[in-house]
């Protein structure tokens, strides 16, 4: 006999939403499911090639921890070759 009141609520008509449109209904423990890709717009099922515009993990990390963008951090790490050559030259006496 299962314990009462420990199981999640079941929504037999949960809406699956992709790009602001309801694309299908299914059963779930959530009343609404928000997805980026589903079988109606996935390149494998549609036979087309599509580049998904999703945020990269590094950019998300940088934004989350307030470090600016990943591109700015990469630019800061690159030393200027002209300045390094001047600083690293030694005078021979």
Curated annotation (Swiss-Prot):
Recorded GO CC terms: ribonucleoprotein complex; ribosome
GO biological process assignments: translation
Region (Disordered): 68-93
SUPFAM superfamilies cross-referenced by the UniProt entry: L28p-like (SSF143800)
PROSITE patterns: RIBOSOMAL_L31
Molecular function terms from GO: rRNA binding; structural constituent of ribosome
Entry function: Binds the 23S rRNA.
Family recorded in the similarity comment: Belongs to the bacterial ribosomal protein bL31 family. Type A subfamily.
UniProt name for this protein: Large ribosomal subunit protein bL31
Lineage of the organism: Bacteria, Bacillati, Cyanobacteriota, Cyanophyceae, Synechococcales
């Amino acid at each position: 006999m299962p314990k009462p009141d420990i199981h999640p609520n079941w929504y037999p008509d949960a809406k699956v939403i992709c790009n602001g449109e309801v694309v299908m209904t299914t059963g779930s423990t959530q009343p609404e499911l928000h997805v980026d890709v589903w079988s109606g717009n996935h390149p494998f099922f549609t036979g087309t090639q599509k580049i998904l515009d999703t945020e990269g993990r590094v950019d998300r990390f940088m934004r989350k921890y307030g470090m600016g963008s990943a591109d700015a951090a990469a630019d800061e790490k690159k030393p200027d070759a002209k300045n390094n050559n001047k600083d690293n030259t030694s005078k021979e006496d």
